[in-house]
Amino acid sequence: MCKHLSLTPLAFTVAAAFAINAPVWAHGDRHPVTHPASHSGGLHTQATKQAAKPAFDIVHTRITTEGNIATFHMAVSGRAGVTRPTPSGKLAGSQVFSYVWPTSLDPSTVGFDAKSGILAFAVTSHPDFDDTPLFDESGDGQATNDGHVWHSHWVVLQPDEACGKGALKVVDIPDGTKPRLPKTWPGLPILIDSPGWSPRFSRDTVEVRVPFDDIGVVQAASFDGVTAALRVNASVHNPLLCVVNVFKVASGDLSLPGKVQP
């Protein structure tokens, strides 16, 4: 695992990802918000004219704290959460749509090994597989068929050329290794946590309330906002989950300029 990962390769990765601009098949993109709510603090981003995916066209990103709770907030020019991947019927090659908050937090903050990559909080939807085995998000009595329902993760990211030039992946766990993992790790061979914090969607906004043992670490952190598509490797092998299309970056360059508001 990378022991000294800086923001420089991360910024390069995002620029490369924009250049890749892989096509993504989806439905439900056009749901304009005619009276978007006002958003204060955090990062404000210009709406994209005639955005191809307004549900992922970031206009505001923020993290605030109250007590030991951090609220991850993102607003878009369309209706948040209305667009999900089109089911493919199989795991291999399937897609994940995401709202992501890359942070300066060390991965050890949430139970991974220290300095193991870039810690990001994410809200995702992927109809072809379920990675929250402890939770029944749809309330149908089955905990293994809810991948299409928007849900939250912590992920650790690193660049990997196997995903494409300058592309990011969720860090793989090599065979025979036993890295430190959160108690709610879903059993996949990647650095991912499924903590069960439920996202709340309202018109143009998605928010998630997340408790922390040490809120001071969060208050000292910086962040950015990203919307992106990821894809499961067609061979279902390392690298298992790659970022294949970045829809938008709040700062434009992934410099993590956002400051957490106490």
Please tell me what each predicted stretch does.
Residues 22-26:
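Sec/Tat signal peptide C-region and signal peptidase I cleavage site
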Residues 27-31, 105-109, 220-262:
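Acidic/polar low-complexity flexible segments
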Residues 9-19:
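Bacterial N-terminal signal peptides
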Residues 158-211:
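Short helix-loop boundary/capping segments
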Residues 53-158:
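Surface-exposed, glycine/proline- and aromatic-rich loop segments on solvent-exposed faces
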Residues 27, 83-93, 200, 218-228:
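Extracellular/secreted glycoprotein ectodomains characterized by long, lumenal stretches
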Residues 27-54:
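N-terminal low-complexity, Pro/Thr/Ser-rich intrinsically disordered segments
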Residues 1-10:
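Bacterial N-terminal signal peptides that target proteins for export
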